[in-house]
Amino acid sequence: MDRRVVITGLGGLCGLGTDASSIWTEMREGRSAIGPISNSEIHELKGMIGTEIKVLPQHDIDRKQLISMDRFSLLAVLAAKQAMLQAGLSCNEGNAHRFGATVGVGFGGWDATEKAYRTLLLGGATRTELFTGVKAMPSAAACQVSMNLGLRGPVFGATSACASANHAIASAVDQIKLGRADVMLAGGSDAPLVWIVLKAWEAMRVLAPDTCRPFSADRKGLVLGEGAGMAVLESYEHAAARGATMLAEVAGIGLSADAYHIAAPAVHGPEAAMRACLVDASLNAEDVDYLNAHGTGTKANDQIETTAIKRVFGDHARSMSISSTKSTHAHCLGAASALEMIACVMAIQEGVVPPTANYREPDPDCDLDVTPNVPRERKVRVAMSNAFAMGGMNAVLAFKQVP
């Protein structure tokens, strides 16, 4: 039996807000969180901008747990707890083996790694903190979510750069469809506002000096940010049996690889992933009302994504609404497509397409309707989310209203 998978809870933190509701409110209105980075340890950067979570929400995680967590893991746990709360779920001895988690992480614990470097090489110490190794591993986020919520089913991480969260969600859907779990926490987390990470991205010459302007002719690159987004996924039967509110259904998944270049984008991979997603969801191109674009704000990525969208959707590419919410929350790497999942689900819930903020000049090479600067009321029955990662790893998800 092909089990349907629905979303019953959302959680998130990023520069826009510290829960899914506040993130969506800011995103919907096109209010960008991009601004100066306040971390005093970050210096000598050409562009000192990003999206930071200024103050974390109150939580019940004690100090003994916190010392074993890098920031990206903490963000994942906080988002997961929010999602479980909205879903009205909790783990116990009777159901824990049917609850699991997959968390996408792009970079992982570079904060712990950089602190170890400073301690050993600059401070002259002979050893690092006890938990440096386990704090830094990308899978730590999934481990910490499991331990903090008591999940004993399938638990693992997904690491595919900017597509990590979509790959994690896709994998979680598979666990439910295969009957290995009834409930999965899925999403992504990253905390890349660390000096060594920012310097690495600066070296690639892709960071914008001012802000992120996806699809605008005067765009100058991407902006990095920290954040996490998590969803509670359930089999339709499990959610219906307990009378849960179903926010959306995960209708389809499309995965592909460019097999082309470690950094440069290509058209054929994104095109293949979008086509595969439509087939998996049994959708026609005309069924998609809203597409949340990968839309990083770099010259090459936005142009190539536009071309891929035109190839897949044909004439409908000019009828559906498109936007890049990275213009508001920036590129949160492993968390990016998790935050964009929130945008898709809430667009379906409220019938509003969030805009592409900071847009100034039309680009003839990006000539689709990217919903510039102002939200648009529109019935959204189906929303698609693109995630195209460095190295050509592509993951596309389709979400739809629950009948």
Swiss-Prot record:
Matching Gene3D superfamilies, A to Z?
A: 3.40.47.10
Active site annotation, chain numbering: C162, H294, H331
GO CC terms, sorted: plasma membrane
Q: Which UniProt keywords apply?
A: Cell inner membrane, Cell membrane, Membrane, Nodulation, Plasmid, Transferase, Transmembrane, Transmembrane helix
Q: Fetch the InterPro entries from UniProt.
A: Beta-ketoacyl_synthase (IPR000794), Ketoacyl_synth_AS (IPR018201), Ketoacyl_synth_C (IPR014031), Ketoacyl_synth_N (IPR014030), PKS_Beta-ketoAc_synthase_dom (IPR020841), Thiolase-like (IPR016039)
Q: Name one GO biological process term.
A: fatty acid biosynthetic process
Where does it localize? Cell inner membrane
The highest taxon in the source lineage is Bacteria
MF terms (GO), sorted A to Z = 3-oxoacyl-[acyl-carrier-protein] synthase activity
This enzyme's EC code(s): 2.3.1.-
- Domain (Ketosynthase family 3 (KS3)): give its ranges: 2-401
Instruction: Tell me where the transmembrane regions lie.
Output: 329-348
Described by its record, this protein's role is as follows:
Proposed to synthesize NOD factor fatty acyl chain. Involved in the synthesis of a highly unsaturated fatty acid moiety, which forms part of a lipo-oligosaccharide that is responsible for host specificity.
**Stored PANTHER family:** 3-OXOACYL-[ACYL-CARRIER-PROTEIN] SYNTHASE, POLYKETIDE SYNTHASE-RELATED
**What's this protein's family per the entry?**
Belongs to the thiolase-like superfamily. Beta-ketoacyl-ACP synthases family.
Stated name of the protein: Nodulation protein E
Name its species: Rhizobium leguminosarum bv. viciae
Tell me the gene name: nodE
